[in-house]
């Protein structure tokens, strides 16, 4: 009986890609229903039958005015909410009604974003080897990953990973996971989808739970998809950003800063500490750990993609690091036009950045800069840090990092 003719090391080497994971395409989608922030306080207090809470409504108006959000998109229409009054109450059993929405609409919205990414990628969907699906909106078995696989007609053998209940940092998490998959599986093409719908968190106002109202003033619906792969075939694939490194950390003394709990009443949202202060206090350490090995200490010399959890977070990070206002332009644009879409936000920002960079005649997809950072902030308090390298817009070729 003949022995093996190859070693484990040879097999291992053959299994792995040569170059870094690269974002090859981006697609985004929102529900059709658009809500303008200036009109939202009146609408919100009317649909939840809370107009008698005049002082609370004034507080909510101030929250909306300070949010720096111009508009958001929401699957929940006035008609649907009128038919489901328990979803409009502050704490009424309503999980079944919420689940009925999200188990259908989360994969459907994800499909719309994925189809755009696949079209831009230009390769047959049969070449997708892995699917990473992320949502904080509901839980089901088989999951939204399974539903999307069926909807898109992906191969039954596609390797799926479903990530539920991660929260706002997860846009960084999915890129970190996709990087590992792409670099450790030669020829892999990873479809990453983040799809978020506020149907799980929508509820009426309460004097005793002002942090829930913060969420009502910020959250919007959206889905984003990216294709990630290493060693791109540049005859047909157009690299956008390289994923150079990725890490996750829990901030010290931050337990309970951001919590979400799935209950009969839906997903309840809690802000228990000074979240902007906690993030800005620790941001320099995350930047140093990520960029010191690269010899980068000037954080105005890199492009920025930061989860827009709210304007105060962005303001305090800018102040702490001494950032010029234009570094957060793409981030603030997405906050203004879509609100906080949880995990999908940073992928929307990448899309906005590469498009605006091309429109403005910049040399690279990263606003003319070579190196960049992507931050995700969320429950824990958890921070995801991804170091990115842009690609020249003129040639579309990758740069050796």
UniProtKB/Swiss-Prot annotation:
Biological pathway: Secondary metabolite biosynthesis; flavonoid biosynthesis
Name of a matching Pfam family: Chal_sti_synt_C
Ranges in coiled-coil conformation: none
Gene3D superfamilies in the record: 3.40.47.10
Catalyzed chemical reaction(s): (E)-4-coumaroyl-CoA + 3 malonyl-CoA + 3 H(+) = 2',4,4',6'-tetrahydroxychalcone + 3 CO2 + 4 CoA
SUPFAM superfamilies tied to this protein: Thiolase-like
MF-aspect GO terms: naringenin-chalcone synthase activity
Keywords of this entry: Acyltransferase, Flavonoid biosynthesis, Transferase
GO terms under biological process: flavonoid biosynthetic process
EC code(s) of this entry: 2.3.1.74
Record's keyword annotation contains Calcium: no
Active site, renumbered: 168
PANTHER family listed in its UniProt record: CHALCONE SYNTHASE, HYDROXYMETHYLGLUTARYL-COA SYNTHASE
Family note: Belongs to the thiolase-like superfamily. Chalcone/stilbene synthases family.
Summary of the function given for this chain in its UniProt record: The primary product of this enzyme is 4,2',4',6'-tetrahydroxychalcone (also termed naringenin-chalcone or chalcone) which can under specific conditions spontaneously isomerize into naringenin.
Name of protein: Chalcone synthase 6
Organism the protein comes from: Sorghum bicolor
């Amino acid at each position: 009986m003949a022995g093996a003719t190859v070693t484990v090391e040879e097999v291992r080497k053959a299994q792995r890609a040569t170059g870094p994971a690269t974002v090859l395409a981006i697609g985004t989608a929102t529900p059709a229903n658009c809500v303008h922030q200036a009109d939202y306080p009146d609408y919100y207090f009317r649909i939840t039958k809370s107009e008698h809470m005049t002082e609370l409504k004034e507080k909510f108006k101030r929250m909306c005015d300070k949010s720096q959000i111009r508009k958001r998109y929401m699957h929940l229409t006035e008609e649907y909410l009128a038919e489901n009054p328990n979803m409009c109450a502050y704490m009424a059993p309503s999980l079944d009604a919420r689940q009925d929405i999200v188990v259908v609409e989360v994969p459907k919205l994800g499909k719309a974003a994925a189809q755009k990414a696949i079209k831009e990628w230009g390769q047959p969907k049969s070449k997708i080897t892995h699917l990473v699906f992320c949502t904080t909106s509901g839980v089901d078995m088989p999951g939204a990953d399974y539903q999307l696989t069926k909807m898109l007609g992906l191969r039954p053998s596609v390797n799926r990973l479903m990530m539920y209940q991660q929260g706002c940092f997860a846009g960084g998490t999915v890129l970190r996971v996709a990087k590992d998959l792409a670099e450790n599986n030669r020829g892999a093409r990873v479809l990453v989808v983040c799809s978020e719908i506020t149907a799980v968190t929508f509820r009426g106002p309460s004097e005793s739970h002002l942090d829930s109202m913060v969420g009502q003033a910020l959250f919007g619906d959206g889905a984003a998809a990216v294709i990630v792969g290493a060693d791109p075939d540049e005859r047909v694939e157009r690299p956008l950003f390289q994923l150079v490194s990725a890490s996750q950390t829990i901030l010290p003394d931050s337990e309970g800063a951001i919590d979400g709990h799935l209950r009969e009443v839906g997903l309840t949202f809690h802000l228990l500490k000074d979240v902007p202060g906690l993030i800005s206090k620790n941001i320099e350490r995350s930047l140093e750990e990520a960029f010191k090995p690269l010899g980068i200490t000037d954080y105005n010399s890199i492009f920025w993609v930061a989860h827009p959890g709210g304007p105060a977070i962005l303001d305090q990070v800018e102040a702490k690091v001494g950032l010029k206002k234009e570094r957060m332009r793409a981030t603030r644009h997405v906050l203004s036009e879509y609100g906080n879409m949880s995990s999908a936000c940073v992928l929307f920002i990448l899309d906005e950045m590469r498009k605006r960079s091309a429109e403005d005649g910049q040399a690279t997809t990263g606003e003319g800069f070579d190196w960049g950072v992507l931050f995700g902030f969320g429950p824990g308090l958890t921070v995801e840090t991804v170091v990115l390298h842009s690609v020249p817009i003129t040639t579309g070729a990758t740069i050796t990092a």
